[in-house]
Amino acid sequence: MASLTHLDATGAANMVDVSDKAATARTARAEGAIVMRPETLRLIREGDAKKGDVLGTARLAGIMAAKRTHDLIPLCHPLLLSKVRVECEPDAALPGIRITAEVRVQGPTGVEMEALTAVSVACLTVYDMVKAADRGMRIEGIRLLEKSGGRSGSYAADPA
């Protein structure tokens, strides 16, 4: 089992020193979903939510969140991200919205947390924008789908 890189010999939390690591291409993809009543999904699809464009706002919130991950997660490094893509897809089978994020960087550390943060905040934004219609919505299934680059190599999640 790999050691925890954010803990020193005494068990205290520390930001990992990446100053000696080479900048390499790194990518991460994450997913999540927000499950809601069919009527709530219909409001979103038809553009009838009182707060406006739910999916567009959630997409932008996810992008902004990826860029601010270092402000939200204490031991994350600030990164010069080269790409953040957030997709919000209505899914009647849930019913709800499936959200995915892809983040890229040319840097000394990975972007898994940025992808996960983008999905999380996009889901929270959907909740915020339609909570007046459906307070029983559930955010679920947030996970890393895949990552590539860096010393630890590639990772792909088992199919759900």
UniProtKB/Swiss-Prot annotation:
Annotated active site: D128
CDD domains, alphabetized: MoaC_PE
MF term (GO), any: cyclic pyranopterin monophosphate synthase activity
Subunit organization: Homohexamer; trimer of dimers.
Annotated keywords: Lyase, Molybdenum cofactor biosynthesis
Domain of life of the source: Bacteria
Binding residues annotated for substrate, in chain numbering: L75, C76, H77, M113, E114
HAMAP family, alphabetized: MoaC_B
Pathway given in the UniProt record: Cofactor biosynthesis; molybdopterin biosynthesis
Protein purpose: Catalyzes the conversion of (8S)-3',8-cyclo-7,8-dihydroguanosine 5'-triphosphate to cyclic pyranopterin monophosphate (cPMP).
EC number: 4.6.1.17
The protein's name in its UniProt record: Cyclic pyranopterin monophosphate synthase
Reaction catalysed by this enzyme: (8S)-3',8-cyclo-7,8-dihydroguanosine 5'-triphosphate = cyclic pyranopterin phosphate + diphosphate
InterPro entries the record matches: MoaC, MoaC_bact/euk, MoaC_sf, MoCo_biosynth_MoaA/MoaC, Mopterin_CF_biosynth-C_dom
Higher taxonomy: Bacteria, Pseudomonadati, Pseudomonadota, Alphaproteobacteria, Hyphomicrobiales
The family this protein is said to belong to: Belongs to the MoaC family.
GO biological process: Mo-molybdopterin cofactor biosynthetic process
Family annotation (PANTHER family): MOLYBDOPTERIN COFACTOR SYNTHESIS PROTEIN A
Keyword Lyase carried by entry: yes
